[in-house]
C-alpha cells in the first residue's frame, strides 16, 4: 500500500513537471483544500495493467483564473462605488446657489404649503430648473429655520413670564410677612388687655346716681315700683377720677 502511494506521488510529479508542480502548490495554498480535491480526479484504466495513473484536469487552473477575475471585478466595483459615493457627498455638501426669482418663488410656495407631495415637488423642480431632491432639501431647511425662530420666540416669551411671576412671588411673600407681623402684634395686645385684672378698689357707686334712682322709683306707679323691686338692679360703676355733674 505504501508503494502504491509513492507511485501515485511520482506519477503526479512526472505528469505536471516542475512548473506544474509549483503552480499546483500555489493553488493549494490559495484555494480551499475541498475545492482542489473535488477538481482532482483519479482514474484506474483497465489497459494500464492495474497501475494507478493520475489525470489532472485543466479545471484547476481555469477555476483559479475565474476566481481571480471575480476578485478583481469585485475590487474594481467597490472602488468605483466608493468614488461615486464621494462625488455624491461632495455634490450634496455644496451650497445651492439660487437666483432672486427662484428664492421668491420658493418662498411663495412655502407660504402656501410648508410640505409638498411628489407631484408638486417634481413640477416645482421643473419650473425652477432644479432637481426634485434640491427642492426637497430646501423645504426641509426652510421648515427647520421656521421652527427654530418660533422656538426662540416662545423661549423669550416664557422667560419674560418667568421673570414677572418671580417678581410677583417676591411681592406676595413680603406682604405675607407684613401680615404675619401685624397679626402677631395685634394678638399680643389683645391678649394683654384681656388678661390684666381690673382692681376692685377703682370701682364704686356714685351717691348722686343712687339718690336719683331712689327718687325715680318713688314717683313711679305702684306696679312699676313693684316690678322694679322684684327685679334686681345693677350697680352703677364709675371711676373715682371722673366726677359726676350732680356732685
From Swiss-Prot:
Subcellular location: Nucleus
Signal peptide start-end: none
GO cellular component term, pick one: nucleus
Pfam families associated with the record: HALZ, Homeodomain
SMART domains named in the record: HALZ (SM00340), HOX (SM00389)
Entry comment describing in which tissues the protein is expressed: Expressed in seedlings, stems, leaf blades and panicles.
SUPFAM superfamilies attached to this UniProt entry: Homeodomain-like
Chief localization: nucleus
PANTHER family, per the entry: HOMEOBOX-LEUCINE ZIPPER PROTEIN HAT14, HOMEOBOX-LEUCINE ZIPPER PROTEIN HOX15
Family from the record: Belongs to the HD-ZIP homeobox family. Class II subfamily.
Protein name: Homeobox-leucine zipper protein HOX15
Amino acid at each position: 500500500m505504501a508503494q502504491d502511494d509513492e507511485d501515485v506521488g511520482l506519477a503526479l510529479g512526472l505528469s505536471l513537471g516542475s512548473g506544474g508542480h509549483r503552480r499546483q502548490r500555489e493553488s493549494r495554498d490559495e484555494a480551499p483544500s475541498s475545492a482542489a480535491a473535488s477538481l482532482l480526479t483519479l482514474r484506474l484504466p483497465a489497459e494500464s495493467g492495474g497501475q494507478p495513473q493520475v489525470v489532472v484536469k485543466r479545471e484547476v487552473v481555469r477555476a483559479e483564473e475565474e476566481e481571480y477575475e471575480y476578485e478583481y471585478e469585485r475590487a474594481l466595483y467597490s472602488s468605483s462605488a466608493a468614488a461615486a459615493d464621494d462625488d455624491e457627498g461632495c455634490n450634496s455638501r455644496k451650497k445651492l446657489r439660487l437666483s432672486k426669482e427662484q428664492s421668491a418663488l420658493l418662498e411663495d410656495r412655502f407660504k402656501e404649503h410648508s410640505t409638498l407631495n411628489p407631484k408638486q415637488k417634481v413640477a416645482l423642480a421643473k419650473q425652477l430648473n432644479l432637481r426634485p431632491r434640491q427642492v426637497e432639501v430646501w423645504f426641509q431647511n426652510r421648515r427647520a429655520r421656521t421652527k427654530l425662530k418660533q422656538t426662540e420666540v416662545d423661549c423669550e416669551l416664557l422667560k419674560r413670564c418667568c421673570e414677572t411671576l418671580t417678581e410677583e412671588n417676591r411681592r406676595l411673600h413680603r406682604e405675607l410677612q407684613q401680615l404675619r407681623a401685624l397679626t402677631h402684634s395685634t394678638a399680643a395686645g389683645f391678649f394683654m388687655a384681656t388678661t390684666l385684672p381690673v382692681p376692685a378698689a377703682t370701682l364704686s357707686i356714685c351717691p348722686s346716681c343712687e339718690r336719683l334712682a331712689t327718687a325715680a322709683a318713688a314717683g313711679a306707679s305702684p306696679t312699676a315700683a313693684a316690678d322694679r323691686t322684684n327685679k334686681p338692679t345693677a350697680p352703677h360703676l364709675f371711676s373715682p377720677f371722673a366726677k359726676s355733674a350732680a356732685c
